[in-house]
Amino acid sequence: MRMGKRYLTIILLMSMALGTVWAQKQVVYTPTWTAQAQFAGFYVADAMGFYKDAGLDVVIKHPTASSSGINRLKKGESQFVTLQLVPAMEMIDDGDQLVNVMQYFQQSGLMVVSHEPLKSFESLNGKRVGRFRVGISLLPIALGRKLNLDIEWIPFASHTNLYVSGAIDATLAMNYNELYQLKMAGQRLKKDQLLYMRDVGYNVPEDGLYVTKDYYKTHRTEVDQFVKATIKGWEWVAAHPKETLDIVMLYMRQTGTHSNLSAQQWMLDECLKLLVHPKTGKRSYQLDPEGFDLTNQILCEGGVLKKPITYKQMTQP
């Protein structure tokens, strides 16, 4: 079988990494969701021993229905979490003390999928549109308010059933996840049914790495070590996508997460594109001030933020 030898090699690598005795500083990282290729750089950094080499004993603890990543961060159960920029900014606006220590997704994977052709975001006026219950949905909601559009937002958990059943006119989706699900559900989507936010002037950064302000100030060494090792992980992913898929599938099996290689291949391919800055064509792993300002503007004008958040407040408190 194609996977057998690779899995054996990966298991051996993980065993060797776990056997390193001089990594003493234990920290916990929590992704946004269950195990999937969206977090490949972290899995690789763990499996290949990059965290151990940096002097860290990293535990990857995925969120549950009763314990989200941000809840774990607030309780001190996790020191590092992945958050999208939009909800992170809303939380800071509400008084939470968060620091962006690494921005790895430089582009937006958010899109609108519609039953009818879309000319622009304004085409959603008067429509029923599915949205995620939390997170990135705040951006299009704010944009709709800014443009004075009459959109009925219908919350969904994580599936595409509302759209497939015809209960809604359109739905928000991530190009690396829900778009694939819709295609696998038999939806024959034409180009004019797909509206990518990044193609219509709203290309905001998404997934980044966050810590609390207190942890940032008292554990700068650990923060720097974790960031550098994670960047090394993502760079390895970009250079070895096929081997990365095997590592991702291994972590999914270990956590009891169900998926298939084809779905994770799609996700990894799309996520690798999001790592690249749209103007420089490079992976910078830093929060782009221009993208940050655009996000600030949309969220403020759409009433999500009470006042603008400064770049320094976000990255260097």
Give residue spans per PLM region.
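Long, low-complexity C-terminal extensions of enzymes
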Residues: 300-317
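Secondary-structure end/capping motifs
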Residues: 218-304
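Sec-dependent N-terminal signal peptides
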Residues: 7-17
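Pocket-lining segment of extracytoplasmic ligand-binding domains
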Residues: 86-87, 158-162, 168-257
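Short, glycine-/small- and polar/acidic-enriched structural segments
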Residues: 25-165, 169-174, 196, 203
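Sec/Tat signal peptide C-region and signal peptidase I cleavage site
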Residues: 18-23
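N-terminal secretory signal peptides that target proteins for export/translocation
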Residues: 1-4
